[in-house]
Amino acid sequence: MAEARKRRELLPLIYHHLLQAGYVRAAREVKEQSGQKSFLTQPVTLLDIYTHWQQTSELGQKQKAEDDETLQAKKSRVSDPVSSSESSDQEKEEEAATERAKATPRPTPVNSATAALPSKVKEKGKTKTANKTVNSVSHPGSGKTVVHLLSGKSPKKSAEPLANTVLASETEEEGNAQALGPTAKSGTVSAGQGSSSSEDSSISSDETDVEVKSPAKPAQAKASAAPAKDPPARTAPGPTKLGNVAPTPAKPARAAAAAAAAAVAAAAAAAAEESESSEEDSDSEDEAPAGLPSQVKASGKGPHVRADSVSAKGISGKGPILATPGKTGPAATQAKAERPEKDSETSSEDDSDSEDEMPVTVNTPQARTSGKSPRARGTSAPAKESSQKGAPAVTPGKARPVAAQAGKPEAKSSEESESDSGETPAAATLTTSPAKVKPLGKSSQVRPVSTVTPGSSGKGANLPCPGKVGSAALRVQMVKKEDVSESSSAELDSDGPGSPAKAKASLALPQKVRPVATQVKTDRGKGHSGSSEESSDSEEEAAPAASAAQAKPALEKQMKASSRKGTPASATGASTSSHCKAGAVTSSASLSSPALAKGTQRSDVDSSSESESEGAAPSTPRVQGKSGGKGLQGKAALGQGVAPVHTQKTGPSVKAMAQEDSESLEEDSSSEEEDETPAQATPLGRLPQAKANPPPTKTPPASASGKAVAAPTKGKPPVPNSTVSARGQRSVPAAGKAGAPATQAQKGPVAGTGEDSESSSKEESDSEEETPAQIKPVGKTSQVRAASAPAKESPKKGAHPGTPGKTGSSATQAQPGKTEDSDSSSEESDSDTEMPSAQAIKSPPVSVNRNSSPAVPAPTPEGVQAVNTTKKASGTTAQSSSSESEDGDEDLIPATQPSTYALRTSVTTPAALSRAASQPSKSEQSSRMPKGKKAKAAASAQTSSAVETLPMMPPQSAPIQPKATNKLGKSKLPEKQQLAPGYPKAPRSSEDSSDTSSEDEEDAKRPQMPKSAHRLDPDPSQKETVVEETPTESSEDEMVAPSQSLLSGYMTPGLTVANSQASKATPRPDSNSLASSAPATKDNPDGKQKSKSQHAADTALPKTGRKEASSGSTPQKPKKLKKSTSSSPAPTQTLPNSITQRLLEQAWPLSEAQVQASVVKVLTELLEQERLKATEAIKESGKKSQKRKLSGDLEAGAPKNKKKKEQPVPRASAVSPEKAPMTSKAKSKLDKGSAGGKGKGSPGPQGAKEKPDGELLGIKLESGEQSDPKSKSKKKKSLKKKKDKEKKEKKKGKKSLAKDSASPIQKKKKKKKKSAEPAV
């Protein structure tokens, strides 16, 4: 409370001080951050307070004489600070900082302690300059400084808003250390870290100046931030980053949080940072010198020094990243994640800019982002740097989250690092700018260089991390940072350009982070590795695109290794990693998914993720974007940053990345991230989303998402926005990235960027995406990545449109990646996604996801999973709907939920994160989320969809809403039920946790499942194909899917049920090949959703947790199913045919994705129809579908039901429990809906009817499903029957198309099919 009170007291002072100083914008932002409409005139001004303090404090007295001169000198020297003597400046700076932000002074001292005299001096000058000066001065004084200020400011600002406000002034004064910490965090994490700070600063300072300054500035900056922001603006250009930075402020809130976290991390990292800082500094300085400094500074500031350094490194590019830090500020973790995301984003943007501008910059941005992330991460970055320098240090940041992991990650990192490095060089080279390269070289080189590069590498690492780290980076950073740091660095560095990618990753993370932030953090630590990989990915992405390929493999390897390596640590990390990667990939999604999966499969996923990432990497931008997006691409905004996911970091994507683990988790920024610039743009949007999501989610630190938001988010301060942003960012990045992450998605997926809300990401809140976003955004998704929300990233998914798509895809992928199930798939998915992502990404991203994913995945079982995941991701919407519903749901939730749910689910949702986390948690969360979240997911789904599929969102949104509404309405009932249960489920999450365990186990299975799915492949493929039929539609469908998710979400639960069934029916899945196809086909209406769900389920299926989640979800499903059924009348019908054909023709993986796509399509159509005909459709559907379905599905259903009933026994117990919570009914309903839908194909009405039956059936079905073996045979038979019937029904459906009722039926059929498919 004290802090809040102080903040309340400080804000007005800061606000007025800013106004007096002429920093109107900053003042306005402060006011916005504070949430107050007006500030009363303060009788006392900060200057008065500062003066008094100066006179009364020992420091003041000692420095008084000096200060007097200094103050004047500062004021006059505002622009000069950089050159001012650093010692005196330090002191002066301290004073100035103090003056500027009371808190700052102390920090300043710390800073001065920090030793970045130059920066301090600068800072001081800046400080003195007052905020206004700060901006300008900082800018001029030292670009760095400016950046710093910016960053600092942002962070500060955020902090301020958060707690940092106090931080800013009072705290600093009072809690100088404390505030500083946070602020420092922002700034440098200085206070506590004075030295740390210093180091941080150093790093930040990198440009030493910057950093020191940063610290002081941070508080100051914070105050100044706004202004600083401007001027530093880094100003805008170099400042692109700065621009990002500016957003940072928004982030700042996040930043504040981040700052706090960062502070902690920073402290840990401080040392590392310190050393690193030095190196970085050198590095930075080398690089920075040119313009970097200012940027760096800004960046540094933002990132908190680290970021800063990174920033510095990234220089301008980083600036934004810095901003991210600001973001970080709010959520240190998030911030970090976010930062990264944002950073990424910024980075991305900057990167883009930077890249042009300065490779280094790019790097830096990433690095910075990373830094940021690190910062948040902490120190991770620092640690990372440290790590580079001294892995351990890194650990700190990461350690913080992953300290333990750190080691692991480190190892992993190392490997990765090397791997990366190897690749990186390419990437780096690719990246090329000399500076960049250099760092890259260094980086690549490595590690050694790492150290050297620390700055670079470190930064790079950071950078890479950042973006990715932001998501991945973060994660990576953690991991990478730590160890990979170098590597990462290398990668990142190498990535310079990659950076963006990385940034993207970051973003993704952010998205995720946000949501995932937590996760991320955790993940991050763990993820880090992933991150690292992702980072690499990112960098690869960025860099390479060329590199990408190569890096990819390496990365992949790395990642894999990393992932694997990190897995343990990375479990979450993995997630994160994955995430990151995913982030990168999906960043958020990945994160999320990966996290989940990863957690579960982590290794796998990690690999997958990595793969994905890598896959994504190329795409990565998308992915990374996602990731980065998250990271923004995060920055995705960051251009890539968030990219979404990673995009650069936006983070949003949440996925952004951002994750600091927390962020990651939290954020989503979760969302994650992405497209570089475009992505960026989107990512940002997404990111925020993601971010927002995430924040809610994880960080709810919006930060996480915020992260995604990173810059965007920042801009989107709204964390939620952030989330979206995250997602969006993610998306964007994704877009850029392909929005790889489409947004956070990417890693943030869309954030990922998504983060949509940063992941909508954020799942945390949203989802949990650092971006992008997550809902950043994306978040998951990237969608969320998220922020991807749109995409997943909210971006994630779609949203940001591109990103989103990408994100979505990414997210999805990420998820897949995460799921990893299909590494390749993921990769492919990712890649695919990436491509499409970029293309489709936007709207279809999901679709793309689906398609791509599926396509890619199709080949691979993993792919399938990927598909699943992807699908999930893509589906984020769809998946969201289905798997995602669980996973996706998270995703979507992230996106959608991002905020809402993400928060709630927080974990779950981080879209990306969620995804990542989700995956691990996915079941859990999924369950959890699915239920609660899902319900929300439904609602969220909309959001998710919206977010995730932002692009799609509209359709979805509206439709979805209707649908969602319908479904939601119904769903909601269940949801409510479910929520209760859902939240029970959430609690169930515990169960789910168990489930998760199961899930984990199942996860293991999942891969198998995918294989099964593969088996199913033939049919499902067709189905999927059908889905794929219309990527765009798919997208829309996907949108629908989210809706479906809603449908599915509820449906998903249903799907989950289906999934459960799938799970249960895993046998069914096994039989799935046939059954799935047939059922899927037949069930398509339901199947579609169900399939989707099932797909999700499939994904989930593998996961027991999912089953449970399914069960938990079941309730939702039934309701959803009904509506879904109703909803997807015509489309469904169409789908069935196509689905059937496709199922027959295509491989399951594709099938799944496609199915989802078709489902989405159907859903979309249905949504529209539903809107118009929802009522009629429901009624007619009820009647006709009941009849038809009863006739058609009944036959099929009967077999299925029978099977299920038979199966029930096994699962009955299981189901009972699951369903018992409420899930029972819901589940039954869902199941029945599923079964009924599938089996009976009861449309809405029937669904209703069946619901009762369904409950029993569902339960039984679930039980039955549990008995895989029995189910299988029966299922196969059933499937065959269903297929026949489905065909019949298709005919009927066609007829019914005219009639809405048919739609529902077919929808159900499709769902069933899908369920079957997923089951497969």
Swiss-Prot record:
There is a cross-link at K655 (Glycyl lysine isopeptide (Lys-Gly) (interchain with G-Cter in SUMO1)). Sequence repeats lie at residues 212-295, 296-366, 367-436, 437-505, 506-550, 551-624, 625-680, 681-714, 715-774, 775-839. Residues 1234-1244 have a biased composition (Gly residues). Ubiquitous in adult and embryonic tissues. The modification Phosphoserine is found at residues 83, 85, 87-88, 151, 154, 169, 386, 413-414, 433, 443, 590, 593, 662, 664, 669, 671, 760-761, 765, 767, 794, 853, 1034, 1191, 1216, 1242, 1301, 1303. PROSITE patterns: LISH. One of its GO terms (cellular component) is nucleolus. Residues 1272-1296 have a biased composition (Basic residues). Residues 273-288, 346-358, 660-677, 822-833, 992-1002, 1030-1039 have a biased composition (Acidic residues). The modification N6-acetyllysine is found at K132, K153, K301, K318, K327, K521, K626, K630, K655, K922, K976, K1249. The keyword Iron does not apply. It is found in: Nucleus, Nucleolus. Residues 212-839 are annotated as: 10 X approximate tandem repeats. It holds the Pfam family Treacle. Residues 186-205, 213-228, 246-272, 422-435, 566-597, 633-643, 733-749, 843-855, 937-946, 1124-1136 have a biased composition (Low complexity). This is Treacle protein. It comes from Mus musculus (Mouse). The lineage of its organism: Eukaryota, Metazoa, Chordata, Craniata, Vertebrata. The gene is Tcof1.
